[in-house]
Amino acid sequence: MGTPSELVDKLMSDIGAIADDIQDYVRHPGADFTRMRKMGAGDVIRALVCMGAGTLGHELDGFLEAPKACTPSAFCQQRAKIEPEALLQLLLRFGPGVPARAADARGIRLAAVDGSEVVMQRNPRDAETHSPKSNGSGIGYNSVYATALLDMAGGAFLDAVVQPGPAKDEPAAFRELADRCDPALVLAGDRNFAGYNNFAHCLERGVGFVIRLKDSFAARLLGAGPLPDEADEDVELLLSRSRRAELRADPG
């Protein structure tokens, strides 16, 4: 499998599989998508994946055949029934199925980790994604932050973590991706992901990593010197009720 038509067929098959189990991914199981509608669960997911950047009305025009035409309002109602987990599961099903080029002579497969902010329609009532700060407009904006894992050999996204924009935490997203990825991958990340916690997390998980360091971080790391065999250290401590300087200088 590697031709464009084969990849499209694989994507449509994976969408169909998610739609068949849609009750696992709806907000109200047993109620949502239990009646026949112009747009079923598979149609909604396919639209979310395949739509362009035009207005919703323009994108819906021609998406379904005339007898099944759907208004933007009806589409939004159907879309609201589906949990984001459905799209994550679609990504996890489809991404690993994209054929990758062979690893290098050492058997190494690199996967890049990077994040990007996605600005959405402004909605001050959505406190989770709304930020009052903006580029001088003073009205704020809504956003989410997506940290994705890209197979550099196959060019396919393997996984992603989406967080509210105002509360983004790239190191935490990195650790979540490291937990879910194939241990055979080597994760490559920029300076935002550098940290002892992330390094230790990958080592415990058995995942290789190549992360760019800030100059100050690298200097501290290289200047740390060899670590002792144990963390325990003997210290002498004087306990006294006196605060006299002479006693502190010569406690003997």
What are these regions (language model features)?
Residues 1-252:
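Conserved, well-structured functional cores that handle cations and Mg-NTP chemistry
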